[in-house]
């Protein structure tokens, strides 16, 4: 495995994104394409392993735009909507790759995420969804994950 880590900033906009949904740009120059910013997510790749940090509501667009079809693990920085509400877009990746995706967060954040998106973590007999995420609580320790030390 190579030591080179590729970091792709998938989104770096505010919780609203830039521009706002009413095409409000604030102080950003609307003629500069770099000022179109989706909400926060980061993708790390090292060899054939990858980690996604946060699942913004813009995740589907971010994955397609950056030709990302594999996510080996997800780390959530916190449970706010702008960092979690793209979580459902992990379903297609898990189904195509035929494996559950481990997700990591502190206990409170992970409980909030699991309560909001329980169908991704536990079998839902009503709708027939198989769980596609595996929860892992982290607590201020160094995480050695797929060759990444975080």
Residue ranges and their predicted role:
Residues 1-150:
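Binuclear metal-dependent hydrolase catalytic cores
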